[in-house]
Amino acid sequence: MKKSHLKYDVIVDYNKILDSYRLVVKNTEHKEKLVKYNLFLSSNLIDIYNELNSKCYYHGKYNIFLIKDPKYRIIMSENLKDKIVNQMVSEHILKPVIEPRLIDSNCATRKDMGTKHAFNLCKKYLLKLKRENKDIYVLKFDIKKYFYNIDHDVLIDKLKKIYVDKDIIDLLTNIIYSSNSSYVNKEIDTIINRELKKDLSCYHKEELKRVPRYNYHKGLAIGNVTSQILAIFYLNRIDHLIKEKLSCKYYIRYMDDGIILDYDKERLKYIRRVIEMELAKEKLELNRKTNIYKVSNGFTFIGYRFVLKDNKLVIRIGNKVKTRIKRKIKYLTIHDKEKLIKVKASYYGYMMRADSKCLQYKLKIK
Protein backbone atom coordinates (compact mmCIF):
# COMPACT_ATOMS: atom_id res chain seq x y z
CA MET A 1 0.00 0.00 0.00
CA LYS A 2 1.25 3.48 -0.89
CA LYS A 3 2.31 6.13 1.61
CA SER A 4 -0.34 8.55 2.81
CA HIS A 5 -0.01 12.13 1.57
CA LEU A 6 -2.20 13.44 4.38
CA LYS A 7 -1.22 17.04 5.20
CA TYR A 8 -0.74 18.41 8.72
CA ASP A 9 -2.20 21.79 7.72
CA VAL A 10 -5.43 20.12 6.59
CA ILE A 11 -5.76 18.15 9.84
CA VAL A 12 -5.19 21.14 12.12
CA ASP A 13 -8.64 22.65 11.83
CA TYR A 14 -10.83 24.30 14.50
CA ASN A 15 -13.91 22.26 13.54
CA LYS A 16 -11.96 19.01 13.85
CA ILE A 17 -10.79 20.12 17.31
CA LEU A 18 -14.40 20.94 18.27
CA ASP A 19 -15.61 17.52 17.04
CA SER A 20 -12.82 15.85 19.02
CA TYR A 21 -13.85 17.78 22.14
CA ARG A 22 -17.42 16.47 21.71
CA LEU A 23 -16.16 12.89 21.47
CA VAL A 24 -14.08 13.37 24.62
CA VAL A 25 -17.14 14.76 26.46
CA LYS A 26 -19.23 11.80 25.29
CA ASN A 27 -16.66 9.33 26.66
CA THR A 28 -15.97 11.18 29.93
CA GLU A 29 -17.60 9.36 32.84
CA HIS A 30 -17.06 12.08 35.46
CA LYS A 31 -18.68 15.13 33.86
CA GLU A 32 -17.75 17.41 36.79
CA LYS A 33 -14.22 17.51 35.40
CA LEU A 34 -15.59 19.38 32.39
CA VAL A 35 -17.32 22.20 34.29
CA LYS A 36 -14.27 24.42 34.75
CA TYR A 37 -12.99 23.73 31.23
CA ASN A 38 -16.37 24.59 29.71
CA LEU A 39 -16.43 28.03 31.36
CA PHE A 40 -13.78 29.12 28.84
CA LEU A 41 -14.47 26.50 26.16
CA SER A 42 -13.97 28.63 23.03
CA SER A 43 -10.80 30.15 24.43
CA ASN A 44 -9.44 26.71 25.40
CA LEU A 45 -10.14 25.23 21.96
CA ILE A 46 -8.60 28.24 20.20
CA ASP A 47 -5.49 27.79 22.38
CA ILE A 48 -5.24 24.17 21.20
CA TYR A 49 -5.63 25.28 17.58
CA ASN A 50 -2.95 27.97 17.97
CA GLU A 51 -0.48 25.56 19.63
CA LEU A 52 -0.96 22.96 16.90
CA ASN A 53 -0.96 25.52 14.10
CA SER A 54 2.27 27.12 15.31
CA LYS A 55 3.75 23.61 15.90
CA CYS A 56 4.54 24.36 19.54
CA TYR A 57 2.16 21.84 21.13
CA TYR A 58 3.82 19.69 23.78
CA HIS A 59 2.09 16.81 25.56
CA GLY A 60 1.49 17.61 29.24
CA LYS A 61 1.94 15.58 32.41
CA TYR A 62 -0.22 12.56 33.17
CA ASN A 63 -2.40 12.00 36.20
CA ILE A 64 -1.19 8.52 37.18
CA PHE A 65 -3.28 6.19 39.33
CA LEU A 66 -3.69 2.53 40.21
CA ILE A 67 -6.71 0.32 39.52
CA LYS A 68 -7.47 -3.32 40.34
CA ASP A 69 -9.50 -5.05 37.61
CA PRO A 70 -8.83 -7.85 38.67
CA LYS A 71 -5.03 -7.37 38.59
CA TYR A 72 -3.31 -4.17 39.67
CA ARG A 73 -2.74 -1.88 36.69
CA ILE A 74 -1.35 1.61 36.25
CA ILE A 75 -3.52 4.05 34.28
CA MET A 76 -2.14 7.30 32.86
CA SER A 77 -4.91 9.86 32.48
CA GLU A 78 -4.40 12.98 30.36
CA ASN A 79 -5.59 16.50 31.00
CA LEU A 80 -8.48 17.65 28.77
CA LYS A 81 -6.25 19.47 26.30
CA ASP A 82 -4.15 16.37 25.64
CA LYS A 83 -7.27 14.17 25.45
CA ILE A 84 -8.72 16.42 22.76
CA VAL A 85 -5.46 16.41 20.76
CA ASN A 86 -5.17 12.61 21.10
CA GLN A 87 -8.77 12.19 19.98
CA MET A 88 -8.17 14.38 16.93
CA VAL A 89 -4.95 12.53 16.06
CA SER A 90 -6.72 9.18 16.44
CA GLU A 91 -9.77 10.11 14.34
CA HIS A 92 -8.12 12.18 11.60
CA ILE A 93 -4.51 10.95 11.34
CA LEU A 94 -4.22 7.37 12.61
CA LYS A 95 -7.49 5.60 11.85
CA PRO A 96 -7.96 6.72 8.20
CA VAL A 97 -4.42 5.62 7.29
CA ILE A 98 -3.80 2.63 9.57
CA GLU A 99 -7.21 0.88 9.52
CA PRO A 100 -7.09 -0.09 5.80
CA ARG A 101 -3.65 -1.66 6.34
CA LEU A 102 -4.79 -4.02 9.13
CA ILE A 103 -5.87 -7.62 8.63
CA ASP A 104 -9.52 -8.48 9.31
CA SER A 105 -8.64 -10.78 12.21
CA ASN A 106 -6.75 -8.08 14.17
CA CYS A 107 -9.77 -7.44 16.39
CA ALA A 108 -8.98 -5.30 19.46
CA THR A 109 -10.45 -1.78 19.93
CA ARG A 110 -11.62 -1.47 16.30
CA LYS A 111 -15.09 -0.23 15.35
CA ASP A 112 -17.63 -3.06 14.88
CA MET A 113 -15.00 -5.61 15.97
CA GLY A 114 -13.69 -6.11 19.52
CA THR A 115 -14.37 -9.30 21.49
CA LYS A 116 -17.60 -9.99 19.56
CA HIS A 117 -15.74 -10.18 16.23
CA ALA A 118 -12.89 -12.23 17.72
CA PHE A 119 -15.43 -14.63 19.28
CA ASN A 120 -17.37 -15.02 16.02
CA LEU A 121 -14.17 -15.70 14.05
CA CYS A 122 -12.94 -18.27 16.57
CA LYS A 123 -16.31 -20.05 16.59
CA LYS A 124 -16.50 -19.95 12.77
CA TYR A 125 -12.97 -21.37 12.36
CA LEU A 126 -13.54 -24.18 14.88
CA LEU A 127 -16.86 -25.20 13.32
CA LYS A 128 -15.20 -25.30 9.89
CA LEU A 129 -12.17 -27.29 11.05
CA LYS A 130 -14.16 -29.87 13.02
CA ARG A 131 -15.97 -31.02 9.85
CA GLU A 132 -12.90 -33.07 8.92
CA ASN A 133 -13.23 -34.99 12.19
CA LYS A 134 -9.46 -34.70 12.79
CA ASP A 135 -7.53 -33.59 15.86
CA ILE A 136 -7.29 -29.79 15.96
CA TYR A 137 -4.46 -27.94 17.70
CA VAL A 138 -4.17 -24.32 18.73
CA LEU A 139 -1.03 -22.25 19.15
CA LYS A 140 -2.02 -19.75 21.83
CA PHE A 141 0.56 -16.98 22.21
CA ASP A 142 0.89 -14.03 24.52
CA ILE A 143 3.41 -11.19 24.20
CA LYS A 144 5.34 -10.31 27.33
CA LYS A 145 4.36 -6.91 28.83
CA TYR A 146 3.30 -5.72 25.40
CA PHE A 147 2.31 -2.11 26.11
CA TYR A 148 5.43 -1.52 28.23
CA ASN A 149 7.82 -3.05 25.68
CA ILE A 150 6.71 -1.35 22.46
CA ASP A 151 9.90 0.32 21.23
CA HIS A 152 9.46 4.02 20.40
CA ASP A 153 12.06 4.17 17.65
CA VAL A 154 10.81 0.99 15.96
CA LEU A 155 7.25 2.36 16.07
CA ILE A 156 8.25 5.76 14.67
CA ASP A 157 10.18 4.06 11.84
CA LYS A 158 7.00 2.14 10.98
CA LEU A 159 5.00 5.38 10.94
CA LYS A 160 7.57 7.07 8.68
CA LYS A 161 6.94 4.31 6.14
CA ILE A 162 3.27 5.28 5.83
CA TYR A 163 3.23 9.07 6.45
CA VAL A 164 5.02 11.56 4.19
CA ASP A 165 4.34 14.78 6.13
CA LYS A 166 7.16 15.55 8.61
CA ASP A 167 4.87 17.66 10.84
CA ILE A 168 2.54 14.68 11.29
CA ILE A 169 5.50 12.49 12.27
CA ASP A 170 6.69 15.17 14.74
CA LEU A 171 3.24 15.33 16.38
CA LEU A 172 3.02 11.53 16.65
CA THR A 173 6.57 11.40 18.06
CA ASN A 174 5.61 14.01 20.68
CA ILE A 175 2.71 11.82 21.86
CA ILE A 176 4.70 8.56 21.76
CA TYR A 177 7.59 10.08 23.74
CA SER A 178 5.22 11.37 26.46
CA SER A 179 5.94 8.33 28.66
CA ASN A 180 9.70 9.08 28.65
CA SER A 181 9.64 11.74 31.39
CA SER A 182 11.37 10.76 34.65
CA TYR A 183 8.36 11.80 36.77
CA VAL A 184 6.33 8.85 35.35
CA ASN A 185 8.27 6.11 37.17
CA LYS A 186 8.64 8.29 40.28
CA GLU A 187 4.83 8.66 40.41
CA ILE A 188 4.36 4.92 39.92
CA ASP A 189 6.87 4.18 42.72
CA THR A 190 5.07 6.58 45.08
CA ILE A 191 1.66 5.03 44.31
CA ILE A 192 2.92 1.45 44.73
CA ASN A 193 4.73 2.22 48.00
CA ARG A 194 1.62 3.94 49.38
CA GLU A 195 -0.50 0.92 48.48
CA LEU A 196 2.01 -1.52 50.01
CA LYS A 197 1.57 0.18 53.39
CA LYS A 198 -2.06 -0.96 53.49
CA ASP A 199 -3.20 -4.17 55.15
CA LEU A 200 -2.89 -6.47 52.13
CA SER A 201 -2.39 -10.19 51.66
CA CYS A 202 1.07 -11.49 50.69
CA TYR A 203 -0.35 -12.38 47.26
CA HIS A 204 -1.52 -8.82 46.59
CA LYS A 205 1.75 -7.35 47.84
CA GLU A 206 3.72 -9.56 45.46
CA GLU A 207 1.37 -8.61 42.63
CA LEU A 208 1.94 -4.92 43.38
CA LYS A 209 5.71 -5.39 43.29
CA ARG A 210 5.38 -6.86 39.79
CA VAL A 211 3.66 -3.77 38.35
CA PRO A 212 5.99 -2.74 35.46
CA ARG A 213 7.83 0.56 35.10
CA TYR A 214 8.59 2.41 31.86
CA ASN A 215 12.06 2.06 30.35
CA TYR A 216 13.40 5.02 28.37
CA HIS A 217 12.06 5.01 24.78
CA LYS A 218 9.85 2.03 25.57
CA GLY A 219 6.13 1.64 26.17
CA LEU A 220 2.90 3.44 25.34
CA ALA A 221 0.86 5.33 27.92
CA ILE A 222 -1.94 3.04 29.12
CA GLY A 223 -5.14 5.06 28.83
CA ASN A 224 -4.37 7.12 25.71
CA VAL A 225 -6.78 6.68 22.81
CA THR A 226 -3.81 6.87 20.41
CA SER A 227 -1.98 4.12 22.33
CA GLN A 228 -4.73 1.66 21.43
CA ILE A 229 -4.49 2.07 17.67
CA LEU A 230 -0.67 2.35 17.72
CA ALA A 231 -0.54 -0.92 19.68
CA ILE A 232 -2.73 -2.82 17.20
CA PHE A 233 -0.64 -1.37 14.35
CA TYR A 234 2.79 -2.22 15.84
CA LEU A 235 2.54 -5.93 14.93
CA ASN A 236 0.89 -5.37 11.54
CA ARG A 237 3.96 -6.63 9.64
CA ILE A 238 3.88 -9.89 11.61
CA ASP A 239 0.10 -10.21 11.17
CA HIS A 240 0.51 -10.08 7.39
CA LEU A 241 3.48 -12.48 7.53
CA ILE A 242 1.41 -15.04 9.49
CA LYS A 243 -1.62 -14.74 7.21
CA GLU A 244 0.12 -14.40 3.84
CA LYS A 245 3.63 -15.90 3.94
CA LEU A 246 2.91 -18.65 6.48
CA SER A 247 -0.59 -19.19 5.01
CA CYS A 248 -2.31 -19.37 8.39
CA LYS A 249 -5.98 -19.06 7.44
CA TYR A 250 -7.18 -19.53 11.01
CA TYR A 251 -5.33 -16.76 12.81
CA ILE A 252 -6.83 -14.21 15.24
CA ARG A 253 -5.06 -11.52 17.27
CA TYR A 254 -6.58 -9.54 20.11
CA MET A 255 -3.92 -6.97 21.08
CA ASP A 256 -1.15 -9.02 22.78
CA ASP A 257 -3.02 -12.37 22.63
CA GLY A 258 -3.17 -14.48 19.51
CA ILE A 259 -4.31 -17.92 18.36
CA ILE A 260 -3.54 -20.02 15.29
CA LEU A 261 -5.64 -23.14 14.62
CA ASP A 262 -4.32 -26.08 12.57
CA TYR A 263 -4.49 -29.86 12.23
CA ASP A 264 -0.68 -30.15 12.23
CA LYS A 265 1.00 -29.77 15.63
CA GLU A 266 4.51 -29.85 14.12
CA ARG A 267 3.60 -27.03 11.75
CA LEU A 268 2.42 -24.96 14.74
CA LYS A 269 5.77 -25.60 16.47
CA TYR A 270 7.54 -24.24 13.38
CA ILE A 271 5.21 -21.21 13.25
CA ARG A 272 5.93 -20.51 16.90
CA ARG A 273 9.68 -20.41 16.18
CA VAL A 274 9.11 -18.02 13.26
CA ILE A 275 6.94 -15.73 15.43
CA GLU A 276 9.64 -15.68 18.13
CA MET A 277 12.29 -14.66 15.56
CA GLU A 278 10.06 -11.97 14.03
CA LEU A 279 9.10 -10.57 17.45
CA ALA A 280 12.80 -10.22 18.30
CA LYS A 281 13.12 -7.83 15.32
CA GLU A 282 10.38 -5.73 16.94
CA LYS A 283 12.23 -5.94 20.31
CA LEU A 284 9.49 -8.10 21.83
CA GLU A 285 9.27 -11.65 23.15
CA LEU A 286 6.64 -14.27 23.89
CA ASN A 287 5.34 -14.81 27.39
CA ARG A 288 5.91 -18.12 29.18
CA LYS A 289 2.15 -18.78 28.87
CA THR A 290 2.59 -19.37 25.12
CA ASN A 291 1.80 -23.01 24.29
CA ILE A 292 0.20 -25.47 21.88
CA TYR A 293 -2.99 -27.20 23.03
CA LYS A 294 -5.23 -29.92 21.71
CA VAL A 295 -8.64 -28.28 21.20
CA SER A 296 -10.38 -31.37 22.62
CA ASN A 297 -8.67 -30.50 25.93
CA GLY A 298 -9.88 -26.91 25.68
CA PHE A 299 -8.26 -23.48 25.52
CA THR A 300 -9.19 -20.00 26.75
CA PHE A 301 -9.26 -16.95 24.49
CA ILE A 302 -10.78 -13.47 25.03
CA GLY A 303 -12.34 -14.72 28.26
CA TYR A 304 -14.16 -17.73 26.75
CA ARG A 305 -13.33 -21.41 27.15
CA PHE A 306 -13.53 -23.31 23.84
CA VAL A 307 -13.66 -27.14 23.94
CA LEU A 308 -14.41 -29.81 21.33
CA LYS A 309 -16.20 -32.73 23.01
CA ASP A 310 -17.19 -35.67 20.79
CA ASN A 311 -16.77 -33.32 17.83
CA LYS A 312 -19.27 -30.89 19.38
CA LEU A 313 -18.14 -27.33 20.13
CA VAL A 314 -18.79 -26.24 23.72
CA ILE A 315 -18.20 -22.61 24.71
CA ARG A 316 -18.24 -21.45 28.32
CA ILE A 317 -17.17 -18.37 30.26
CA GLY A 318 -13.52 -18.68 31.39
CA ASN A 319 -12.85 -19.06 35.11
CA LYS A 320 -10.91 -15.78 35.46
CA VAL A 321 -13.69 -13.78 33.80
CA LYS A 322 -16.29 -15.60 35.90
CA THR A 323 -14.46 -14.60 39.09
CA ARG A 324 -14.09 -10.99 37.89
CA ILE A 325 -17.81 -10.73 37.06
CA LYS A 326 -18.81 -12.14 40.46
CA ARG A 327 -16.54 -9.70 42.30
CA LYS A 328 -17.77 -6.72 40.28
CA ILE A 329 -21.44 -7.54 40.86
CA LYS A 330 -20.86 -8.13 44.57
CA TYR A 331 -19.09 -4.76 44.89
CA LEU A 332 -21.71 -2.80 42.91
CA THR A 333 -24.60 -4.46 44.77
CA ILE A 334 -23.25 -2.82 47.93
CA HIS A 335 -21.81 0.45 46.59
CA ASP A 336 -23.55 1.51 43.35
CA LYS A 337 -26.91 -0.08 42.48
CA GLU A 338 -27.53 2.40 39.65
CA LYS A 339 -24.32 1.39 37.87
CA LEU A 340 -25.08 -2.28 38.61
CA ILE A 341 -28.03 -2.22 36.16
CA LYS A 342 -25.80 -0.98 33.29
CA VAL A 343 -23.01 -3.43 34.14
CA LYS A 344 -25.41 -6.39 34.23
CA ALA A 345 -26.78 -5.41 30.80
CA SER A 346 -23.21 -5.32 29.45
CA TYR A 347 -22.39 -8.72 31.00
CA TYR A 348 -25.57 -10.20 29.54
CA GLY A 349 -24.40 -9.32 26.02
CA TYR A 350 -21.04 -10.97 26.75
CA MET A 351 -22.53 -14.09 28.40
CA MET A 352 -25.27 -14.85 25.88
CA ARG A 353 -22.62 -15.94 23.33
CA ALA A 354 -21.62 -18.84 25.60
CA ASP A 355 -23.32 -21.70 27.42
CA SER A 356 -23.86 -19.66 30.59
CA LYS A 357 -27.54 -19.93 31.58
CA CYS A 358 -26.71 -21.32 35.02
CA LEU A 359 -24.24 -18.48 35.69
CA GLN A 360 -26.74 -15.88 34.45
CA TYR A 361 -29.41 -17.32 36.76
CA LYS A 362 -27.06 -17.43 39.74
CA LEU A 363 -25.96 -13.79 39.25
CA LYS A 364 -29.48 -12.64 38.28
CA ILE A 365 -28.30 -11.41 34.89
CA LYS A 366 -31.02 -11.33 32.24
Protein language model annotation of sequence segments:
Residues K3, K7, H92-D151:
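Active-site-proximal segment of RNA-dependent polymerases
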Residues L23-V35, F65-M76, I103-S105:
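Glycine-/proline-rich flexible loop or hinge segments
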